[in-house]
C-alpha cells in the first residue's frame, strides 16, 4: 500500500478523484492508494466494478472507519462541501485521521454554486469553520462560470478538478 492516500468523499469528491487519476502526471499521484467513500450505493457499485476500493458511508453515522487509514502518512481528502455527505464526512475523516496519527492531512474542497441555495452554503461554511486546524484548499464553484465562460458545466468541472490536481502535484498544499 502507498503511504499516500487520496480519499474521495461524496459525489463531487469521487468525480474529482476520477479526473485526477485520468490526467495526473506525477508518479506519486498515480501510485497513491485511492478510496472512494459515498452514501450512494449505486455510485459505489459502479466504482467497485471498475476495480476501485469503496466505502459505504451511512448518513446517520458520526464516525469514519480509521482502519482504512493504517500506514498512511499523507492523506488528501477530496470533497464537495454543501451537501450532507461531503460536508459531514470530510470533517469526520479529517479529524479521525489526525487523531489516529496520520501525519499530514490536507483537504481539497469545492464550495456550492449560489443557485444551490443558502442552506448548502451554510453547510459548507460550517464545515470549513470546523476544519480551521487542518490545511484546506478551497475551490469555489461559483468562480467556474467566470473563469471558464465558454465551457459547458461538465468541462468547467474538469478544469476545477485539474486545479485540485495542480495544487497536489505542485506541493503547495
Task: Name each model-derived stretch.
Residues 1-173:
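Tubulin/FtsZ superfamily GTPase core signature
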Amino acid at each position: 500500500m502507498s503511504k499516500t492516500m487520496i480519499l474521495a468523499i461524496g459525489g463531487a469528491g469521487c468525480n474529482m478523484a476520477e479526473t485526477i487519476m485520468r490526467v495526473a502526471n506525477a508518479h506519486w499521484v498515480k501510485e497513491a492508494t485511492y478510496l472512494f467513500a459515498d452514501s450512494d450505493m449505486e455510485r459505489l457499485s459502479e466504482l467497485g466494478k471498475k476495480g476501485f476500493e469503496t466505502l459505504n458511508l451511512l448518513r446517520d453515522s458520526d464516525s469514519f472507519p480509521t482502519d482504512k487509514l493504517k500506514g498512511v502518512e499523507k492523506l488528501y481528502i477530496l470533497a464537495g462541501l454543501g451537501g450532507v455527505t461531503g460536508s459531514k464526512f470530510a470533517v469526520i475523516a479529517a479529524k479521525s485521521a489526525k487523531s489516529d496519527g496520520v501525519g499530514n492531512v490536507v483537504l481539497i474542497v469545492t464550495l456550492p454554486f449560489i443557485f444551490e441555495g443558502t442552506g448548502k452554503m451554510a453547510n459548507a461554511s460550517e464545515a470549513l469553520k470546523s476544519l480551521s486546524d487542518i490545511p484546506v484548499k478551497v475551490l469555489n464553484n461559483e468562480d467556474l462560470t467566470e473563469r471558464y465562460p465558454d465551457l459547458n458545466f461538465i468541462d468547467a468541472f474538469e478544469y476545477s478538478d485539474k486545479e485540485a490536481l495542480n495544487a497536489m502535484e505542485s506541493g503547495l498544499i
